[in-house]
Swiss-Prot record:
Reported function: One of the essential components for the initiation of protein synthesis. Protects formylmethionyl-tRNA from spontaneous hydrolysis and promotes its binding to the 30S ribosomal subunits. Also involved in the hydrolysis of GTP during the formation of the 70S ribosomal complex.
Gene field: infB
Region (G5) residue spans: 540-542
Bias (Low complexity): 55-72
Positions of GTP binding: 404-411, 450-454, 504-507
GO cellular component terms listed in the entry, alphabetical order: cytosol
Predominant location: cytoplasm
Region annotation Disordered: where it falls in the sequence: 31-164, 189-266
Family per record: Belongs to the TRAFAC class translation factor GTPase superfamily. Classic translation factor GTPase family. IF-2 subfamily.
Protein name per its UniProtKB record: Translation initiation factor IF-2
Length: 890
């Protein structure tokens, strides 16, 4: 290790010398070297104290000096194996002769010369032998171990500790107590003695006796450390120090706790659970919280408004905030008058809001500006046309709706007018969608609406009556006026629309127009043939009889009505039908009532908006603009609009989006209140519930199905429609039906190809229909299947027990005689005693003599074995009966 240190020392000196030369400090270094050489000569003449001590030690040893001198060259040769061996191969006398010369630090003089570098190493090596013999020969001398040469150069020599000066007590420097502060602190805060472990190889610390003044007589370093520990209050630990005298006044610690709680009696609190009390009683000191008194508001100082303006709907909490009241005060006032509300309930009645304002002396005005903005227009189409400048109005085509009972020939009559064959393509030979056509006739263009005649499509008929100008009431001449015919008449009268009666099927032999006239007169529609004002035309859809006369009557009615519209205005109309197309997305058939609809215009419906991307007529021809009374199929909608929804053209798509977002936000506000509450009556009555999910091709079909299902009344089964939407049955629909245990009903729609395997794996029941009354009948059957069948017991025969035979293998065998009817094996049996039923079970074995038989008739004896019953007695009656299950009715 010493060789390595010496080598490092040499390298360090060489590097320092090179840096010195590069910095241009050679001349300064030479002057310093000359000055150092002169000092070295003087020091060589006068030996140092260290050399004297070494000589004394060598003289005292028993070994001769020659042996020590012989040992030094060996150690020198053993330590130094330098780069140039020739310089160290001299004799002992030569090496000793170099010692006084090399102590004068010749390194700065000869930087580039390698020989003086080795002489410097020789000097270092010559000093080391002086130390080691002393440490080995005189181990008992209290001489401090000498540091190696490298450490001598890097570290300063330790300064000899000065003797501690005695403290002179000056009375003027004492405090008011007459004692020095050191005495007070030393006595009051005496650190406890700590056991110090003596580690092998480390310096041993011995206790030093204190002097007369009471100060510990330690060395300078130890005294300084102890003084810092005693006099520094920050290093003190109150818990570890000795107990203070309770009689003396504490001058330093402001957290004195005279009363110590017993640790064994301390309760376990939440702070102990989280480890906050581990430090003991002293460490749990916390700063006392500053008490802040609550602010008491003087109600008299609050100025409540006497007039406010709000918009409906509004919650009870918001209304109370506007009136500077507490919500509890408003709720209390409502409760006193029999109205139960909570904080988040919504007030949508203007009367209730005005009543609250009257009770608290505040006038409340309702702001309708936001509703007007969302409504777009409060005027109807007719009012809008009447308010338009007459110079802008032009004559438009009449909108004619064909209405009547199912199978009375409405669609066939329209096909004859249009010269088409729509009726042949309809499922079940009935119309289940509303169709809109624009056909050219000899008397002009006519827009025709074909409405369904089935009872389920009453909403479609009502919608057709609202949008049309003339109603053609189709009545079959061989059947007369039916239920749906009367309903269509009511819709037409409610809309104040002109009615033209077409008595169809006049080519049939049992056609009787007089019967139709009589029925019309009974419902206040007196025909012209009987002197009334109702126009009647006998027609035949198959032969074409009366069609031209019917068209003339329609043209005459249109002239009388003076139908006009403004084609320059923004388009406004009604949704006839809507559906989800596979490639086009949501599409809608709309009828324009006023204005003109163009490509790229933005539309607003009730629940959705859109921008017209494409527009087609009934012949699938692309159109760029559609005027009044023209039905078109449009695409580019955000969602499927509901049939019958009005639409308006707005400035741009952003405006349309903002209007719909505002409407949806208002609808979400009522979502919680509109949720269906659980029917506790059905729960108490233990009613069954049928859950349905409806998928249809168009929105009108969904309306018809939902309306028909709601008309199914049952005291035993409730029907709950979970979802109803337009489109094919998808995978998500099947998963939802499986999770909710619902039945999927598809009307005029199919199942997606990748969703079909999921139906079998999840076990979901899916029913597809193309005719609506087939769907209604199937739903009724499903409702009936949910009901448990009614069990009926039908008596077959009876037998009397005459004898009882005991068997260790099968138990009791009853010997009986059949008194009535037939006793049949494996049928149910009742055991009666004194006309009281004791047991019901199964007749497991029936024998006649020793043979097993299936049945035994009246008057014959038999052996009967009952399954699981051995307590029958002689004289008991066994009644045989059969259980028959009957399905319940809705």
């Amino acid at each position: 290790m010493e060789k390595v240190k010496l080598t490092k020392n040499l390298k360090l000196k060489i590097k320092n010398a090179q840096l010195t030369k590069a910095a241009g400090l050679d001349k300064l270094k030479q002057k310093l070297a000359q000055a150092g050489s002169s000092e070295a000569k003087s020091s060589s003449e006068k030996p140092s104290a260290k050399e004297k001590s070494v000589k004394v030690a060598l003289a005292a040893t028993s070994t001769p000096t020659a042996s020590a001198e012989q040992a030094s060259p060996e150690s020198t040769s053993r330590r130094i194996r330098a780069k140039n061996r020739s310089s160290f191969s001299s004799s002992e006398e030569e090496s000793s002769a170099h010692i006084p010369v090399d102590t004068s630090e010749p390194a700065p003089v000869s930087i580039a010369d390698p020989e003086p570098e080795l002489e410097v190493v020789d000097e270092v090596c010559d000093e080391s032998p002086e130390v080691h013999p002393v440490a080995e020969v005189l181990p008992e001398q209290p001489v401090l171990p000498e540091t190696p040469p490298q450490e001598k150069e890097l570290e300063p020599k330790p300064v000899k500790p000065a003797e501690p000066k005695s403290v002179v007590m000056i009375k003027s420097k004492f405090g008011p107590t007459g004692k020095h502060i050191n005495h007070l602190l030393a006595k009051t805060f005496k650190a406890p003695a700590k056991e110090e472990k003596v580690v092998a190889g480390s310096k041993s610390t011995k206790p030093v006796a204190s002097d007369k003044t009471g100060k510990p007589g330690t060395s300078e370093g130890g005294e300084q450390n102890n003084r810092e520990k005693q006099f520094n209050p920050a290093n003190r630990s109150p818990a570890s120090g000795p107990k203070r005298d309770a009689g003396k006044k504490n001058l330093t610690d402001f957290r004195d706790r005279s009363k110590k709680s017993d640790e064994s009696l301390k309760a376990f609190t939440g702070r102990d659970r989280y480890g906050l009390n581990e430090g003991g009683e002293e460490d749990r000191w916390r700063k006392k919280r500053v008490y802040k008194p609550k602010k008491h508001y003087d109600e008299a100082s609050i100025q409540r408004p006497t007039h406010i303006k709000i918009s409906l709907p509004i919650t009870v909490k918001d209304l109370a905030t506007e009136m500077k009241l507490k919500a509890s005060e408003v709720i209390q006032k409502l409760f006193i008058h029999g109205m139960t509300y909570v904080v988040n309930d919504i007030l949508d009645s203007e009367t209730a809001v005005q009543f609250i304002g009257l009770e608290f002396g505040c006038t409340i005005d309702i702001d309708y500006s936001e509703q007007d903005k969302l409504c777009l227009s409060n005027d109807t189409v007719r009012d809008e046309i009447q308010s338009t400048d007459p110079s802008k109005l032009v004559i438009r085509s009449p909108i004619v709706a064909f209405m009547g009972h199912v199978d009375h020939g409405k669609t066939t009559l329209i096909d004859s007018l249009r010269k088409s064959n729509v009726a042949a393509t309809e499922a079940g030979a009935i119309t289940q969608h509303m169709g809109a056509f624009c056909c050219s006739t000899p008397v002009g263009d006519i827009t025709i609406l074909d409405t369904p005649g089935h009872e389920a499509f009453s909403a479609m008929r009502a919608r057709g009556a609202e949008v049309c100008d003339i109603v053609v009431l189709v009545v079959a001449g061989d059947e007369g006026i039916k239920e749906q015919t009367l309903e269509a008449i009511e819709h037409a009268k409610a809309a104040d629309i002109a009615i033209v009666v077409a008595i169809n099927k006049c080519d049939k032999p049992n056609f009787n127009s007089e019967t139709i006239y009589r029925q019309l007169s009974e419902i206040n529609l007196l025909p012209e043939a009987w002197g009334g004002s109702t126009v009647t035309v006998n027609t035949s859809a198959k032969t074409g009889e009366g069609l031209s006369e019917l068209l003339e009557m329609l043209a005459l009615q249109a002239e009388v009505l003076e139908l006009k519209a403004d084609p320059s205005a923004r388009a406004r109309g009604l949704v006839i039908e809507s559906e989800l197309h596979k490639g086009l997305g949501p599409v809608a058939t709309v009828l324009i009532q006023n204005g003109s609809l163009k490509l790229g215009e933005a539309l607003v419906f009730n629940d959705c908006y859109g921008k017209v991307k494409t527009m087609h007529n009934e012949h699938n021809e692309l159109m760029k603009e559609a005027g009044p009374s023209i039905p078109v199929l449009i695409t580019g909608l955000s969602d499927i609009p509901k049939a019958g929804d009005p639409f308006f053209v707005v400035k741009n798509e952003k405006t349309a989006r903002d209007i719909i977002e505002a409407r949806s936000a208002g609808q979400q506000r009522f979502a919680l209140q509109q949720k269906k509450r659980p029917n506790f009556d059905s729960m108490l009555q233990n009613k069954k519930t049928l859950k349905l999910m409806i998928k249809a091709d168009v929105q009108g079909s969904i309306e018809a199905l939902v309306s028909s299902i709601s008309k199914i009344k049952s005291e035993k089964v409730d029907v709950e429609i979970l979802t109803n939407s337009v489109g094919e049955i998808s995978e998500s629909d099947i998963r939802l039906a499986a999770a909710s245990k619902a039945v999927l009903i598809g009307f005029h729609t199919g199942i997606e190809s990748h969703a079909e395997p999921l139906i079998k794996s999840l076990g979901v029941r899916v029913e597809l229909f193309t005719v609506i009354y087939h769907a209604i009948d199937a739903i009724k059957e499903i409702m009936t299947s949910l009901l448990d069948p009614i069990a009926e017991e039908k008596d077959e025969g009876s037998a009397e027990i005459k004898e009882i035979f005991r068997s260790s293998q099968v138990g009791s065998i009853y010997g009986c005689i059949v008194t009535e009817g037939i006793m049949t094996r494996n049928h149910k049996v009742r055991v009666l005693r004194n006309k009281e039923i004791l047991w019901k079970g199964t007749l497991s074995s029936l024998k006649r003599v020793k043979e097993d038989v299936k049945e035994v008739r009246k008057g014959l004896e038999c052996g009967i074995l009952l399954e699981g019953y051995q307590q029958a007695q002689i004289g008991d009656v066994l009644q045989c009966y059969e259980v028959i299950y009957h399905p319940q009715k809705l």
